[in-house]
From Swiss-Prot:
One of its GO terms (cellular component) is mitochondrial inner membrane. It is found in: Mitochondrion inner membrane. Keywords: Membrane, Mitochondrion, Mitochondrion inner membrane, Transmembrane, Transmembrane helix. This is Cytochrome c oxidase subunit 7, mitochondrial. The chain crosses the membrane at residues 36-58. InterPro entries: COX7a (IPR039297). Residues 59-71 are mitochondrial intermembrane. Belongs to the cytochrome c oxidase VIIa family. GO terms for biological process: oxidative phosphorylation. The keyword Kinase does not apply. It is a single-pass membrane protein. It comes from Neurospora crassa (strain ATCC 24698 / 74-OR23-1A / CBS 708.71 / DSM 1257 / FGSC 987). Residues 1-35 are mitochondrial matrix.
Length: 71
């Protein structure tokens, strides 16, 4: 385990990075290097689910019990 014992401590660097971005009023979920990919995936899933449920609810209100057919 000498690699683990002699590993450099990167916490102060990352802490400075996050604190600097936070001082510039950047939202926490937009600071990280992968945040764009994560937020894009989340937004697609969230709005896709919302749209699908609104579509299904409107079909149910109109009296159709299936997604596509007129039955």
């Amino acid at each position: 385990m000498p690699g683990l014992v002699n590993a450099p401590n990167h916490v102060p660097e990352k802490q400075r990075y996050y604190q600097q971005a936070f001082k510039n009023h950047t939202r926490l979920w937009k600071i990280g290097p992968r945040s764009g990919i994560i937020m894009t995936t989340f937004n697609i899933a969230m709005w896709g689910t919302f749209g699908a449920s609104m579509y299904a609810m409107s079909r149910k209100v109109l009296g159709y019990n299936t997604w596509f057919s007129e039955d």
